[in-house]
Design a protein with these regions (language model features):
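Membrane-proximal basic amphipathic "stem/tether" segments
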Residues: 2, 230, 250-305
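Class I SAM-dependent methyltransferase Rossmann-like catalytic core
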Residues: 2-64
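Class I SAM-dependent methyltransferase SAM/SAH-binding core
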Residues: 72-128
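A short acidic, Gly/Pro-enriched loop at the edge of an enzyme's catalytic core
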Residues: 128-140
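A short SAM/SAH-binding and catalytic strip from SAM-dependent methyltransferases
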Residues: 138-151
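A short glycine-rich, Lys/Arg-flanked "PGG" loop and its adjoining helix->strand segment in the class I
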Residues: 153-168
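Conserved class I S-adenosyl-L-methionine
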Residues: 170-197
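Short alpha-helix
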Residues: 189-217
Length: 305
């Protein structure tokens, strides 16, 4: 319980930076337009390192269940990275895509504040994802987000529980990002590929995901040309009950909510988060206004200092 609460508290302390980043990215016209030119919103679904069509059902199979393939973009932030349709042969197949993030309330406020006509983000937490959607998704996408969670292994198990048997979980992450970012903000875990295995680790723990999934899922892991770690996991059987405990999850949430309520209303955490947001928002106001190439150069100089 204490470990879960510590993970939650560390994650909460990373919220101000994340909100300041998106608030100012959406503030400036050129950064917002740059985001849309990079994302596949309104375009064909594109997944780096694989053919997206190979992990989605045929139009006939999708129609037999829900009419459209269900795709969950978990930890989506405000990136709108995946596309909205795919080509089934020559036929355009629409996707029921849901952008899911625990900070949905804040992101939707930013959308409204910046007058952006984009789909609202749906609330959902990777570590408790099956409480929102269970056994019906065709594809779960987690990009640059699993290593930002407070319990990434639990996030993988929960993602698999949302899939029907035969569904896919697609992961795409920068290698060892917590090490790169010095464990600041949401960066508490590293993801890497070692001899075809997916490893999730930090200074306190290390897990072999291939070993964890043995018997109920297959996994293909590779490092693509730009260095990203891409893993494609196919659910082949139901997740063993020994790997999750819904009652324990409820206890964790109740306990964490109680502590959070106390800390916020005691004033300490509330003031700390407000001060952190004010600081990061000030910094991001200027950082996001800079040309992209200059931002990259400054980041490299800071790391070398």
């Amino acid at each position: 319980m204490d470990k879960a609460n510590n993970g939650m508290n560390n994650w909460i302390e990373g919220i101000p930076y994340e909100l300041a980043f998106w608030n100012n990215l959406y503030r400036w016209r050129w950064t917002y337009e740059g985001l849309l030119s990079w994302s596949n919103y309104g375009k064909e679904l594109c997944l780096e390192g694989i053919d997206a069509r190979s992990v989605l059902p045929s139009a006939t199979a999708a129609a037999a269940r829900s009419g459209k393939p269900i795709v969950l973009d978990v930890g989506a932030g405000m990136s709108y990275a995946p596309g909205n349709f795919y080509l089934n042969g020559t036929e355009r197949q629409e996707i029921d895509i849901r952008y899911i993030d625990p900070l949905a309330f804040h992101y939707n406020r930013i959308l409204k504040k910046r007058h952006k006509n984009l789909p609202e983000v749906t609330f959902g937490v990777a570590e408790y994802l099956s409480s929102c959607v269970a056994d019906e998704a065709d594809l779960v996408i987690i990009q640059n987000a699993l290593d930002h969670s407070f319990a990434p292994i639990k996030g993988i198990i929960e993602a698999l529980r949302t899939l029907h048997t035969g569904g896919f979980l697609y992961l795409n992450h920068h290698p060892n990002e917590a090490e790169t970012e010095d464990y600041k903000g949401f960066h508490k875990f590293n993801i890497c590929e070692e001899h075809g295995k997916l490893i999730i680790w930090n200074k306190e723990s290390r897990r072999d995901v291939n070993e964890l999934l043995n018997g109920f899922a297959t996994i293909d892991v590779k490092t693509v040309e730009n260095g990203h770690i891409v893993a494609l996991i196919k659910k082949t059987a139901e997740v063993p009950a020994s790997l999750y405990d819904d009652k324990a999850s409820i206890r964790e949430l109740c306990h964490s909510n109680h502590l959070l309520f106390y800390q916020v209303y005691s004033g300490h955490l509330s003031m700390k988060l407000k001060c952190s947001y004010a600081f990061y928002n000030f910094i991001q106001f200027f950082v996001q206004a800079l040309p992209h190439n200059l931002k990259i150069k400054l980041k490299k100089l800071i790391k070398q200092a």
